[in-house]
């Protein structure tokens, strides 16, 4: 999920729809306070979060990586890698880190693709009702673009 920009109810609706079946949630920035509030409402939610360019004064990291189900997931809001002008910088960073999956937001444009062996997803903007899901089944990565 990314870019809620104050659309808390849409964020909460997405979380409520998937709270029982999602292993974790990753919030990709530009709505830090919205997501922080969600962590209080849903204390059982496992999550990771990074700062976006509109999360002024944030102490969150600009990017992070996790290991999940034997896959490495690299994620950022995207602005440090200039994703509005192309994906080569963020994909290069994901490759450098040995990532299998690369997640970013910032552009508000939802899309999923596989490039240079890396599964790349921008879930779009929560404010506009877009989000993404990734399912790892028997080591295979499945990306799902979603809208509420």
Whereabouts are the PLM-identified features?
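Active-site neighborhood of phospho(di)ester-bond hydrolases with catalytic His/Asp-centered motifs
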Residues: 1-2, 24-30, 48-53, 74-77, ...
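Binuclear metal-dependent phosphoesterase catalytic core
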Residues: 12-13, 69, 92-98, 114-148
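Internal catalytic-core helix/loop-beta-alpha segment
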Residues: 72-107
């Amino acid at each position: 999920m990314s870019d809620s920009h104050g659309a808390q109810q849409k964020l909460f609706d997405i979380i409520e729809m998937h709270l029982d079946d999602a292993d974790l949630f990753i919030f990709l920035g530009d709505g830090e306070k919205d997501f922080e509030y969600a962590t209080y409402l849903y204390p059982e939610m496992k999550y990771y979060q990074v700062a976006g360019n509109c999360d002024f004064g944030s102490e969150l990291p600009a990017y992070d990586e996790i290991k999940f189900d034997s896959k490495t997931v690299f994620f950022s809001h995207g602005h440090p890698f200039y994703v509005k002008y192309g994906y080569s910088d963020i994909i290069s960073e994901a490759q450098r880190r040995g990532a299998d999956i690369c997640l970013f937001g910032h552009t508000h444009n939802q899309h999923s693709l596989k490039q240079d062996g890396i599964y790349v997803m921008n879930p779009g903007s929560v404010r506009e009702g877009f989000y993404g899901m990734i399912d790892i089944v028997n080591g295979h990565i499945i990306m799902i673009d979603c809208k509420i």
